[in-house]
């Protein structure tokens, strides 16, 4: 069953809910992050992305499968904890970057006009 968020509970903390969109745009994969910070690729149009599957990777991480085909991010427990702790900061930075580049969280629509010949 596809989900639009996951819940995480770390030892001694409350339960945190993280949206699929946030997890997708913050994917730790080289495909998203690049091989250095200046090579990161801004993720756009991910507002409606959902999680199709989650698999444990050993005892240290989760691999999350998204409905847009992205599945190369390995989310370590430390990275997930960082996302929880810094959610507001990272989300604000992401929204600012979208605005700066004139991009959107919405999928880009292709418009096709039909004409009678």
Put a short name on every predicted segment.
Residues 1-117:
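Motif-centric detector for short Cys/His coordination patterns
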